[in-house]
Structure formats: structure tokens, C-alpha cells
Design a protein with these regions (language model features):
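Extended, well-folded interaction surfaces typified by the phenylalanyl-tRNA synthetase beta subunit core
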Residues: 2-13, 19-40, 44-47, 51-104, ...
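Short, conserved charged micro-motifs
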Residues: 22, 56-59, 113-123, 243-248, ...
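Short amphipathic C-terminal alpha-helix that caps PH/PH-like domains
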Residues: 67, 127, 249-257, 347
């Protein structure tokens, strides 16, 4: 299971700004009830193993959001607030055979911290989160890979094109231009992930209005879009082969930035098949849970108020309840919810497994 290490100061910052008091001892006692294993919880650090079915907990920022609901009973917000933006991302039809899923989002007004220590911790957390998502959802960047850019250093609209391997740009943390062929053969990230582009004679790049390469997914970003502690406006790209994985990665990175005061904006996307969409979609997903299934597997009848409190602790909302079904709203980024049994598990955890008599 992936392990994350989070500064208690970050959790305190993101919990207290919503009016809740962070208590490390109480956290250590109760957070495992969410379905996690704590390796270490002291005054400075929380080291925690995240179960594979909860990739939405893989950063200190998204974990803090869950802590507010689960530990402090904060009202859940399963809908993600996304303003309609004007930025355009246009995908060439050639990408259909190379890397067909391309998504994007903008986040503005991010404040990474009041001190260098806070800002440095923010950059480290953002980088760590990307790599954790590449492993957990991206399956080593095959299903999904993420690029995060300083939006002020590039000029929209952006295009995603297929180019030959003699195309040059300066990759992240390098001083000189390299060709795509050189990157795949010589750059550490190229060596690690070149196999994902085996068999292609053209390669995906994202370029801005001035033809500068932002990204060569799933390998490396361009150096000129590097995010720093001073970055306040971000462009996120996610590309891959699996739409659900890409969508979850996009939303989770955007949510991480939102925790620092950022406002998420949608991108007008022209896909490789020519359709036009405004993404990401922050609307929660409505689920039906048969009452017979809930009562049968939990072994007792929960009152409506108990169900409402339980699902709120897990980030969802009870919408209605009739003779047959319970209707729930769950966040779109809860990638793990595929079946009514997954909803049942959330209710059981939110209610308290120790309170259920089977």
C-alpha cells in the first residue's frame, strides 16, 4: 500500500481555517477507522498507509479534506465548485491512436504559504501527489499521466499534436534543448517511460499559441513552465488511455490546489474525435442503494439520520429515501465507488464498524 508522510502543521493549517481544532492524539485514535493504517503520528508528522481503493487520500491536502468530514463532521461538499473558464485545449485527430484521452483544468489564486517553509512544503507535496497518483491510478503513467504548469509563463490556446522524434525542446530541469529521440534514449524519465510509446513514429506534445512545447506526455514537461513557490495560476494536463483514471487525477490535483485558496476553472476541450466539452465536471454522481441490501448486510435498520451522518462523514450526501432505495450523492473523484456494495461499505465505516452488530 502507498504511504504518505504529512506534516501535522499542514493538517492543522487546512483544518483550523475551516474552524476546527486539530488534535493529533484524537486523530491517531480515530483516523484508522476511516480504513487506513497509521505508521507514525506524533506532534510533527503523520505517516499513514493508504488503502489502494482510496487514491483520493494520497496527499496531505486531500486527506485534510477527508479529515474535516470524518473526524470533525464538517458538512460534506460532494459537488466540486468549478467556474466556466475561457481557456481552450484542442486535440489533433492523430492522438486517437497515440494517447486518446486528454483533459485539462485551470486553477487561479493559489497561495502556497506565508513563509518559505510553507511554500517549499507545498511544492514537495504537489510533486509527491503526482507521483503517488501516477502509481495508484496511472499504473505507471500508462492509464494516466499528469503535467502541472505555471500558466503565466505560457500563452493559450493550447494544442495537442503528434510530432516526429526530431522535434526539439528544453525538458524540465535541463539547460539545453533535446530532441524527442534524445529524451527517450538519454533523459532519466525518457529511459523510464519510453516503453509507453514503443511502436509509434509520432509522439504527443502540448504546445501553446507561440508553438512552445509545454509537455511531452507521458514523459516530461518543458522547463519553461516550471512551477515555483511564486506560482499562483496553474494549468493542469492529464493524458492517457483510461478516462476514469484521467478524470480522477485531474480532479484530485485541482482539489489539492483549491485547498490553498485556488479557484478551479473548466477548459473548453476539443477532443481527438472533434467533440467539444467543458471539463472537468464537478457534479457529484447520484447512486441508488437498495434498502434490502443495506439492511441485510449490515444486520440492522439504520435510521435516516444515522445514514445521513454516516455518508456525510465519507464525503457524500443523503438525498432521499423511499420504500425501495436510498439515493446518495457521492463525489465524482471517488473513483472506487463502482457498485452498491461500495456505498454499503462507506455507510458502515461512516456509522462506525464497532457499532454494527452482525
Amino acid at each position: 500500500m502507498p504511504t504518505i508522510s504529512v506534516d501535522q502543521a499542514l493538517i492543522d493549517r487546512l483544518v483550523s481555517k475551516h474552524g476546527y481544532q486539530h488534535d493529533t492524539e484524537y486523530l491517531a485514535e480515530n483516523l484508522p477507522l476511516l480504513g487506513t493504517d497509521i505508521d507514525k503520528c506524533d506532534a510533527e508528522t503523520l505517516d499513514i498507509e493508504i488503502f489502494p481503493n482510496r487514491p483520493d487520500l494520497l496527499s496531505g491536502e486531500t486527506l485534510s479534506r477527508a479529515i474535516r468530514n470524518f473526524i470533525h463532521n464538517a458538512p460534506a461538499t460532494p459537488n466540486l465548485d468549478i467556474k466556466q473558464g475561457k481557456l481552450e485545449l484542442i486535440v489533433d485527430s492523430e492522438l486517437k491512436e497515440i494517447r486518446p484521452v486528454v483533459l485539462g483544468a485551470v486553477v487561479r489564486g493559489v497561495n502556497s504559504g506565508a513563509s518559505k517553509m510553507e511554500s517549499d512544503a507545498f511544492i514537495k507535496s504537489l510533486m509527491d501527489h503526482q507521483e503517488k497518483l501516477h502509481f495508484a491510478l496511472g499504473r505507471g503513467r500508462k492509464r494516466a499521466s499528469i503535467g502541472v504548469h505555471d500558466l503565466t509563463k505560457i500563452k493559450p490556446p493550447f494544442s495537442v499534436k503528434a510530432v516526429t522524434n526530431d522535434t526539439h525542446f528544453t525538458p524540465l530541469s535541463m539547460d539545453n534543448e533535446m530532441s524527442i529521440k534524445q529524451i527517450l534514449l538519454e533523459h532519466p524519465k525518457g529511459i523510464d517511460y519510453a516503453h509507453l510509446l514503443d511502436g509509434f513514429d509520432k509522439y504527443p506534445v502540448i504546445v501553446d499559441a507561440e508553438s512552445r512545447i509545454l509537455s511531452f506526455p507521458p514523459i516530461i514537461n518543458g522547463d519553461h513552465t516550471t512551477v515555483t513557490a511564486d506560482t499562483t495560476e496553474f494549468f493542469i494536463d492529464v493524458t492517457g488511455w483510461d478516462y476514469r483514471s484521467c478524470e480522477a487525477c485531474l480532479m484530485l490535483i485541482a482539489m489539492q490546489l483549491e485547498e490553498y485558496g485556488g479557484t478551479i476553472e473548466s477548459v473548453k476541450l476539443t477532443t481527438c474525435d472533434g467533440s467539444i466539452k467543458h471539463l472537468p465536471n464537478g457534479d457529484a454522481i447520484e447512486h441508488k442503494l437498495p434498502k434490502k441490501l443495506l439492511n441485510g448486510l449490515i444486520g440492522e435498520r439504520l435510521e435516516e439520520s444515522q445514514i445521513s451522518r454516516a455518508i456525510n462523514r465519507m464525503g457524500g450526501k443523503l438525498i432521499s429515501k423511499d420504500d425501495e432505495d436510498i439515493t446518495l450523492l457521492m463525489p465524482r473523484w471517488r473513483f472506487d465507488i463502482l457498485h452498491p456494495v461500495d456505498l454499503l461499505e462507506d455507510i458502515a465505516i461512516g456509522h462506525g464498524l464497532s457499532l454494527i452488530h452482525i
